[in-house]
Curated annotation (Swiss-Prot), chain B:
Family note: Belongs to the ATPase A chain family.
Species whose genome carries this gene: Oncorhynchus mykiss (Rainbow trout)
Record GO terms (molecular function): proton channel activity; proton-transporting ATP synthase activity, rotational mechanism
Lineage: Eukaryota, Metazoa, Chordata, Craniata, Vertebrata
Name of the featured protein: ATP synthase F(0) complex subunit a
Chain's gene name: mt-atp6
PROSITE patterns per UniProt: ATPASE_A
Complex and partners: Component of the ATP synthase complex composed at least of ATP5F1A/subunit alpha, ATP5F1B/subunit beta, ATP5MC1/subunit c (homooctomer), MT-ATP6/subunit a, MT-ATP8/subunit 8, ATP5ME/subunit e, ATP5MF/subunit f, ATP5MG/subunit g, ATP5MK/subunit k, ATP5MJ/subunit j, ATP5F1C/subunit gamma, ATP5F1D/subunit delta, ATP5F1E/subunit epsilon, ATP5PF/subunit F6, ATP5PB/subunit b, ATP5PD/subunit d, ATP5PO/subunit OSCP.
Ranges annotated as spanning the membrane: 12-32, 69-89, 98-118, 132-152, 165-185, 197-219
Reactions this protein catalyses: H(+)(in) = H(+)(out)
Topological relation to the membrane, as annotated: Multi-pass membrane protein
Gene3D superfamilies given in the database record: ATP synthase, F0 complex, subunit A
Alphabetic keyword roster: ATP synthesis, CF(0), Hydrogen ion transport, Ion transport, Membrane, Mitochondrion, Mitochondrion inner membrane, Transmembrane, Transmembrane helix, Transport
Subcellular location: Mitochondrion inner membrane
Biological function: Subunit a, of the mitochondrial membrane ATP synthase complex (F(1)F(0) ATP synthase or Complex V) that produces ATP from ADP in the presence of a proton gradient across the membrane which is generated by electron transport complexes of the respiratory chain. ATP synthase complex consist of a soluble F(1) head domain - the catalytic core - and a membrane F(1) domain - the membrane proton channel. These two domains are linked by a central stalk rotating inside the F(1) region and a stationary peripheral stalk.
Length: 105, 223
């Protein structure tokens, strides 16, 4: 039944052709209820696949935490890119600790 | 220069959402609701075991009136310990380093114990201000001291903030200042960092526990 005559907004993402992506996004439900429903959906799918299993290991939670670390890195990227490690091999170090060399904003 | 040392405690904003909002909602995802099954999955079983043991230990010294606080105290403990431990992952933000959050948790809960005590048993609550068996000349001084100590109890929140901030700051200083300065003895600095991380894990758990324990103590006197 995977012919191209489905109503566009109800197809799953994998069935949408690239050219139709913009209009597919336009038909998705972006009301607060819809956003919450999709978050809950995604959470349930992840949970039931990786955590709610008979012999779940540490992988289910570990993937979540690694994703969180990556997300935090992305959030802080602007701020982190200002830090530079000590670049000079110069032993005649000034006594004031001008260690963290901030880029000019 | 002082700002650059404390920069790690500012919550950066991305697309208008501050990182603290993400960091605060993450514990919600990590504690799933138990289903109605006889045997749940391993994560829920482990968490359930921990919650049961903790609540049992916590409620031992409290009388029946205090048992109403069980859900609040246990959920507070879970929240704090999760926030503290998650803050040890790289690049993450620890919301409990913000004084506003900790005081927002400490002051209302402490005030609740005081008001409950004053309302239900005012004589006994005021009686806590004077320990038994004090010599008579000391009484005025001791009442003043005990009152001050009663009002300083919201320092519960300050304690949590200070401990976590200090730990993170130590790690940041060792990483940014010591490590680049002395590359020849870098291995010593790495050992220092490793030990500091272990310390931080311990501190994270202990601080959450102490917060809740003291609160239950205040409750015990007043309920």
């Amino acid at each position: 039944e995977r012919d191209g005559r489905f109503p566009l907004g109800e197809k799953r993402l994998m069935d949408v052709k690239l050219g139709e992506l913009g209009s597919w996004l336009g038909k998705r439900d972006f009301t607060p209820n819809g956003v919450l429903a999709s978050i809950r959906n995604g959470h349930d799918r992840y949970y039931n696949k990786y955590i709610n299993v008979k012999k779940g290991g540490i992988g289910g939670v570990a993937m979540l935490l690694v994703g969180y670390v990556a997300l935090s890195y992305m959030w802080e990227y602007d701020h982190l890119s200002e830090y530079r490690l000590w670049e000079y091999d110069d032993l005649r170090v000034p006594t004031t600790y001008s260690i963290i060399h901030l880029k000019a904003l | 220069m002082t700002l650059s040392f404390f920069d790690q405690f500012m919550s950066p904003t991305y697309l208008g959402i501050p990182l603290i909002a993400v960091a605060l909602t993450l514990p919600w995802i990590l504690f799933p609701t138990p289903s109605a099954r006889w045997l749940n999955n391993r994560l829920i079983t482990l968490q359930g075991w921990f919650i049961n043991r903790f609540t049992q230990q916590l409620l031992l010294p409290l009388n029946l009136g205090g048992h109403k606080w069980a859900a609040l105290l246990t959920s507070l403990m879970l929240f704090l310990i999760t926030l503290n431990m998650l803050g040890l992952l790289p690049y993450t933000f620890t919301p409990t380093t913000q004084l506003s959050l900790n005081m927002g948790l400490a002051v209302p809960l402490w005030l609740a114990t005081v008001i409950i005590g004053m309302r239900n048993q005012p004589t006994a609550a005021l009686g806590h201000l004077l320990p038994e068996g004090t010599p008579v000349p000391l009484i005025p001084v001791l009442i003043i001291i005990e009152t001050i100590s009663l009002f300083i109890r919201p320092a519960l929140g300050v304690r949590l903030t200070a401990n976590l901030t200090a730990g993170h700051q130590l790690i940041a200083t060792a990483a940014f200042v010591l490590l680049p300065m002395m590359p020849t003895v870098a291995i010593l600095t790495s050992i220092v960092l490793f030990l500091l991380t272990l310390l931080e894990i311990a501190v994270a758990m202990i601080q959450a526990y102490v917060f809740v324990l003291l609160l239950s103590l205040y409750l015990q006197e007043n309920v």
